[in-house]
Amino acid sequence: KGLHSFTQDEINELIVRNAFEYGNAVRLKGGDPFIFGRGSEEIDYIESFGIETEVVPGISSSMAVPASQGISLTKRGVSESFWVITGTTSERKLSTDVYLAAQSTATVVILMGMSKLNEIVSIFKKFNKSEIPTAIIQNGTTVSEKIGLGTINSIEEVVLQKQLSS
């Protein structure tokens, strides 16, 4: 929830120091480091020291978690595309992309949006999306996974009933 043990600068320096000291370093990152992560910042910093980098990609939670629940991000006759957006910007404000997404016919995956849920729901309602099926999945694909299913109209109540959080 935005609480980090190390600053990004400390992580960058740790990677470089270990690469020089041990001949290599591995940065194992939870989530996709190139979707609202700092993967490119780390690579740029490390390569500025002449250190070769390699990325071993995984599958983004924005696709894997819905799939694990049988939720299709695109479906013939329903949704031709999907958007992955942040709910909360680095300045802790609601992303303006939420307004655009609410007007789209695309499936919308909102990461880091729980603290802005009330605002997000209001925006989708404003664009007549009250009955859109909605899922909130906390700690997806882990043993502590919690799932709340509803519509834009009901999802805030579902969050309270299921005690979902970010």
Question: How would you label these PLM feature ranges?
Answer:
Residues 1-56, 144, 156:
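Class I S-adenosyl-L-methionine
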Residues 2, 86-87, 139:
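Active-site donor-binding loop signature of nucleotide-sugar glycosyltransferases
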Residues 9-10, 20-26, 38, 81, ...:
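A contiguous loop/helix-start segment that scaffolds small-molecule binding in enzyme catalytic cores
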Residues 30, 34-104, 146-150:
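Class I SAM-dependent methyltransferase SAM-binding "motif I" and its flanking Rossmann-like core
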